[in-house]
């Protein structure tokens, strides 16, 4: 009960062996993102910045994070390519905290993300 936190951390089992994380990063980078999917991500970013419902939109850097996360999601699903559904699945975690409603209504991030997904057509 009174264990030192460092001792507790030292007793945690290792989940990854040396080099496995690098292998996972490389595998994630190898997941294919097609041109239509890139257009979809760009449309999401553009709508968040230019659409009537948002005061603060998503930056190009947010788009890069969205693509990296969607690649990882696809890899975890056992695929070598990203689907629009992968982008939609990770969008709340990647972008929810970055979006602000234009009318300053304090909407939950999940609702703002839903608005964005509903406003942009799937490829």
Model regions: which residues?
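C-terminal engagement/docking regions of AAA+ P-loop ATPases
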Residues: 48-123
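Conserved AAA+ ATPase core "coupling" helix
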Residues: 1-43
């Amino acid at each position: 009960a009174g264990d030192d936190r460092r001792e507790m951390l030292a007793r945690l089992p290792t989940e990854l062996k040396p080099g496995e994380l690098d292998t996972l990063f490389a595998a994630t980078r190898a997941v294919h993102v097609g041109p239509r999917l890139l257009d979809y991500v760009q449309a999401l970013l553009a709508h968040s910045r230019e659409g009537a419902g948002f005061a603060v939109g998503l930056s190009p850097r947010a788009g890069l994070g969205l693509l990296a996360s969607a690649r990882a999601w696809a890899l975890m699903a056992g695929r070598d390519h990203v689907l629009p559904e992968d982008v939609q699945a990770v969008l709340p975690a990647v972008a929810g905290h970055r979006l602000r409603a234009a009318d300053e209504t304090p909407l939950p991030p999940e609702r703002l993300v839903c608005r964005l997904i509903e406003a942009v057509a799937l490829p």
